Amino acid sequence: MLYLTKIRNAESEFTENEQKIADFLRANVSELKSVSSRKMAKQLGISQSSIVKFAQKLGAQGFTELRMALIGEYSASREKTNATALHLHSSITSDDSLEVIARKLNREKELALEQTCALFDYARLQKIIEVISKAPFIQITGLGGSALVGRDLSFKLMKIGYRVAYEADTHVQATVSQALKKGDVQIAISYSGSKKEIVLCAEAARKQGATVIAITSLADSPLRRLAHFTLDTVSGETEWRSSSMSTRTAQNSVTDLLFVGLVQLNDVESLKMIQRSSELTQRLK
């Protein structure tokens, strides 16, 4: 019996940790080549032995055997599906009904949120919030879908009184980066962590003495190595994607948490500014 089928059939018997492992494997089956049991254990907040026992429960000798089998099953399934239906996004195909599409999208986003939240180091997050709160100036960088997340964060921070520079144009991003000073903060948003424009800006910011905070994936990347602080995000999207939907969901969960943490840090004044902003925009209607 195929391991994916075994996972589905045994789901009612899984413990909480086993369910976490099962959800992770199904959501990230296309990326398992680069996943070790150690990395997975850290990401899910469980022990490596739990992952090995899960593999053995399904009939594999260990995680490596299970991982390789799942990779093979995924490749075979992809070839079969590709021959009969068009991939529209992630696991969604042209054969799916709107109801099925809705369920798949919802689950994809749920998993991105669950797995991203499971990674939070709250002590480090509090430190990052304090660093941002003391920054005289904040620059936010990002490309594509990450740029949309960056723009949203910039609007939120400006609303509560922070001096923020956000500009989608990469030349402007680079220009602002080289003008940062010690004490300033650059928030770089990039899931891959390898976009040359974002890496260039991070290098420039570090050279000027600014603090670089990266919102990125767990993968080793140039941005991750440059950053003073990292906030990890997880997305189960495969190569079959039409847009970075669950990636943006994960990134937004991080930026929203940063915003609320900053509001909490200076709650009275922040709430006054939010109220004034609301009153002003109401007058524009």
Curated annotation (Swiss-Prot):
<feature type="DNA-binding region" description="H-T-H motif">
    <location>
        <begin position="37"/>
        <end position="56"/>
    </location>
</feature>
<comment type="pathway">
    <text>Amino-sugar metabolism; N-acetylmuramate degradation [regulation].</text>
</comment>
<dbReference type="InterPro" id="IPR022821">
    <property type="entry name" value="Tscrpt_reg_HTH_MurR"/>
</dbReference>
<keyword id="KW-0678">Repressor</keyword>
<keyword id="KW-0804">Transcription</keyword>
<keyword id="KW-0119">Carbohydrate metabolism</keyword>
<dbReference type="GO" id="GO:0043470">
    <property type="term" value="P:regulation of carbohydrate catabolic process"/>
</dbReference>
<dbReference type="InterPro" id="IPR036388">
    <property type="entry name" value="WH-like_DNA-bd_sf"/>
</dbReference>
<dbReference type="GO" id="GO:0003677">
    <property type="term" value="F:DNA binding"/>
</dbReference>
<feature type="domain" description="SIS">
    <location>
        <begin position="128"/>
        <end position="268"/>
    </location>
</feature>
<dbReference type="GO" id="GO:0045892">
    <property type="term" value="P:negative regulation of DNA-templated transcription"/>
</dbReference>
<dbReference type="InterPro" id="IPR000281">
    <property type="entry name" value="HTH_RpiR"/>
</dbReference>
<dbReference type="InterPro" id="IPR046348">
    <property type="entry name" value="SIS_dom_sf"/>
</dbReference>
<dbReference type="InterPro" id="IPR035472">
    <property type="entry name" value="RpiR-like_SIS"/>
</dbReference>
<keyword id="KW-0238">DNA-binding</keyword>
<protein>
    <recommendedName>
        <fullName>HTH-type transcriptional regulator MurR</fullName>
    </recommendedName>
</protein>
<dbReference type="GO" id="GO:0097173">
    <property type="term" value="P:N-acetylmuramic acid catabolic process"/>
</dbReference>
<keyword id="KW-0805">Transcription regulation</keyword>
<dbReference type="Pfam" id="PF01380">
    <property type="entry name" value="SIS"/>
</dbReference>
<dbReference type="GO" id="GO:0003700">
    <property type="term" value="F:DNA-binding transcription factor activity"/>
</dbReference>
<dbReference type="InterPro" id="IPR009057">
    <property type="entry name" value="Homeodomain-like_sf"/>
</dbReference>
<dbReference type="GO" id="GO:1901135">
    <property type="term" value="P:carbohydrate derivative metabolic process"/>
</dbReference>
<comment type="function">
    <text>Represses the expression of the murPQ operon involved in the uptake and degradation of N-acetylmuramic acid (MurNAc). Binds to two adjacent inverted repeats within the operator region. MurNAc 6-phosphate, the substrate of MurQ, is the specific inducer that weakens binding of MurR to the operator.</text>
</comment>
<feature type="domain" description="HTH rpiR-type">
    <location>
        <begin position="1"/>
        <end position="77"/>
    </location>
</feature>
<dbReference type="Pfam" id="PF01418">
    <property type="entry name" value="HTH_6"/>
</dbReference>
<dbReference type="GO" id="GO:0097367">
    <property type="term" value="F:carbohydrate derivative binding"/>
</dbReference>
<comment type="subunit">
    <text>Homotetramer.</text>
</comment>
<dbReference type="InterPro" id="IPR001347">
    <property type="entry name" value="SIS_dom"/>
</dbReference>
<dbReference type="InterPro" id="IPR047640">
    <property type="entry name" value="RpiR-like"/>
</dbReference>
